[in-house]
């Protein structure tokens, strides 16, 4: 088992295997993710990073022929169990994807969409929640006077922050970020990275990134994956300066991948 410090883990992955039909995509993954920290997953394309992320909220169940075996413990409860309400799980474990995906509706309705699925709030309470979520995503000051406008009217960076606001509006405990800045310009990327630092005060964050410099900047822990296996996991500073595995060093230094 790859363990953290004495801090109790928020997520604990136990002997996780994942299959796309007969293809064995994740192999015996064992990992602990600390609360209110940022854990980055790096590795070449196709190594299983995004697949692993999607097991944390069972997003893979939206597609036929995919299955996970093993255990993923969220606060001590196995989220792969048959008795788990997947919709409630996804409220606890929010996700932001590679490309900004605002719903084709107003900024306000983008934020309230998920909240309405899980909570019954008064109009005043909902307005407060919308402002709270947009402030969390550092977007309130930019959109407070145009909440009725389409989310698609925003710039790319603003759209991604809207998606983050939408994810936090349901008050999740974990945020999954799958390449959240790969489609953004450098200035928007810097805004998102700054936001990640702020959000980890309240959320456990797991981020997939192909940008190793980004992983070094934003994460507390880093996992290097290759061909569906977890090669090395540890403190980000250690992974990037004194990795224990030669395969990790080769990838970090650009000799491979």
Swiss-Prot record:
One of its GO terms (cellular component) is plasma membrane. It is found in: Cell inner membrane. This is Phosphate import ATP-binding protein PstB. ATP binds at residues 43-50. GO terms for molecular function: ATP binding; ATP hydrolysis activity; ATPase-coupled phosphate ion transmembrane transporter activity. Keywords: ATP-binding, Cell inner membrane, Cell membrane, Membrane, Nucleotide-binding, Phosphate transport, Translocase, Transport. Part of the ABC transporter complex PstSACB involved in phosphate import. Responsible for energy coupling to the transport system. The lineage of its organism: Bacteria, Pseudomonadati, Pseudomonadota, Betaproteobacteria, Neisseriales.
């Amino acid at each position: 088992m790859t363990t953290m410090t004495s801090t109790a883990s928020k997520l604990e992955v136990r002997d996780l295997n994942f299959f796309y039909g007969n293809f064995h995509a994740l192999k015996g993954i064992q990992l602990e993710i600390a609360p209110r920290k940022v854990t980055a997953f790096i590795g070449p394309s196709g190594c299983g990073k995004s697949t692993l992320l999607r097991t944390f909220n069972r997003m893979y169940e939206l597609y036929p022929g995919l299955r996970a075996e093993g255990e993923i413990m969220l606060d001590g409860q196995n989220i792969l169990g048959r008795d788990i309400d997947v919709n409630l799980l996804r409220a606890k474990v929010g996700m932001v994807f590679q490309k900004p995906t605002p719903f084709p509706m107003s900024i306000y309705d983008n934020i309230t969409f998920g909240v309405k699925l899980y909570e019954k709030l008064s109009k005043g309470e909902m307005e407060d929640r919308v402002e709270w979520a947009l402030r969390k995503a550092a977007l309130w000051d930019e959109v407070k006077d145009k909440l009725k406008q389409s989310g698609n009217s925003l710039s790319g960076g603003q759209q991604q922050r809207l998606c983050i606001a939408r994810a936090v509006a349901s008050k999740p405990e974990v945020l999954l970020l799958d390449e959240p800045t790969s489609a953004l310009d450098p200035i928007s990327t810097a805004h998102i990275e700054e936001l990640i630092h702020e959000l980890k005060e309240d959320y456990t964050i797991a981020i997939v990134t192909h940008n190793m410099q980004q992983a070094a900047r934003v994460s507390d822990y880093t996992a290097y994956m290759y061909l569906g296996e977890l090669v090395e996991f540890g403190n980000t500073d250690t992974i990037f300066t004194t990795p224990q595995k030669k395969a990790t060093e080769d990838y970090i230094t650009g000799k491979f991948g």
